[in-house]
Amino acid sequence: MSKQFVRSAKNLVKGYSSTQVLVRNATSNDNHQVSKDSLIELAEKSYDSADFFEIMDMLDKRLNDKGKYWRHIAKALTVIDYLIRFGSENCVLWCRENLYIIKTLKEFRHEDDEGIDQGQIVRVKAKELTALLSDDERLNEERNMNIKGRNRKGRRRRGTGRSDENDDDLQRAISASRLTAEEDERRRKQDEDYETALQLSKEEEELKRLQDLQRMQQQQGQQQLQQPMYYDIFGNPITPEEYAQFQLQQQQQQQQQQLQQQPMYYDVFGNPITPEELAQFQQQQQLQEQQYLASMQQQQQAMSNNPFAKSEQSSSSPKRNQLVAASSPQQLQQQKQQEPLIQNRTGNQSMTDKYSKLNELLATGTGIDTFGNVGEARIPAQHTKTGTFINSQGTGYRQVSDDPNHNPFLNSQYTGLPSTSVVPTQTGYGFGNQSQQQSQNNGSNNRGYTLIDL
């Protein structure tokens, strides 16, 4: 009673007409079904243009109501279904023009507090109305049949009063509509289940393909981060194996160029040696030369006062292996053949320069020396400058006689040398390293030698 009172008060406050109030009561938000009297009255009022617009305006508001007022929507669809069957032709035209509103209700859903989907009845009624409005032949046939039945019922109503409450035709039509709606709903569920399963299968397949693609992209990205990209001279990407092969070829070419530019070294036997061995040998050779030069300086200092000592600079020098840098053993042999022979000097250069004139006279002249020798038998004068005879081999060295009585020829010999007696200097290993006692013995033994003894 409270809801009816509130609805009545709202009708008065908003100034609804009797036709609008009739539509509001027929589509109220309660559990009661729409009364048949209200449907018949609304169908009759639909033939009036003013009432028609009021009826359709209120039904349009009910169809666009909120989801929690699902009873308003369901009852409004029931009223529209009755009007297109038993109402005026304008009701059919209005429904066809606003068919999109009815089609949207085919997807209507609403769950109550208990989790029950109350939008099922709305979806069934909307689908049935859409099918009926789309089939003109069926709609015209039902309208003609219902109009004839309504006329018969009108005549019976005038004769029998209110005997049309249990109209069998209306009950059969409602039952047929319900069966059709249930069958369509069952078929739609099956189609929806199949479509849902197919859609899920497609989505799973697409998701799997996307995951595989992402995994491949991640692996490629990791490989690119771990391995740098290499390019050839034309900017084309190459694999690391090709780049390593290219680097190896470059290294081999560089090594070949270095070998071609670097000279080959050979020993005296023509065997190739490495630059390290050459450097080591040169270092050893330099050390040997330094040692040899040091020893030669000592010998020259000791031999500076001995005009008869032979210079052993070239004769006593050690033979050293020579290394030749050449590109081939043939060039080494040619260099050996082209090397000129080095003339080794013997004797003291200063003495040779000093007595060069005398040597020339003695070698080319035809005179006789102090001993009467002629030709090659002549003895150079420098061997007798001390006043005591010394032959060309140095025998009789240190023959200095205090008593010249044994040889009367020595005191009278004069070969152009100064008369000042020359004291011999002990040089060389053979003379300078002898002990003093041995030297005195040699002097006493050699004293008194004559030309005949020598």
Curated annotation (Swiss-Prot):
Instruction: List the Gene3D superfamilies.
Output: 1.25.40.90
Q: Does the keyword Phosphoprotein apply?
A: yes
Polar residues composition-biased segments: 303-329, 340-350, 384-398, 418-428
Asked whether the UniProt record includes Cell membrane among its keywords, one would answer no
Q: Which UniProt keywords apply?
A: Cytoplasm, Endocytosis, Isopeptide bond, Lipid-binding, Membrane, Phosphoprotein, Repeat, Ubl conjugation
Q: Name one GO cellular component term.
A: endosome
UniProt-annotated stretches for the region Disordered: 142-195, 292-350, 384-405, 418-454
The segments labelled Clathrin-binding in the record are 447-454
Task: Classify the main location.
Answer: cytoplasm
**PANTHER family attached here?**
EPSIN-1-RELATED, EPSIN/ENT-RELATED
Protein name, as recorded: Epsin-1
Annotated organism of origin: Saccharomyces cerevisiae (strain ATCC 204508 / S288c) (Baker's yeast)
Give the classification, highest ranks.
Eukaryota, Fungi, Dikarya, Ascomycota, Saccharomycotina
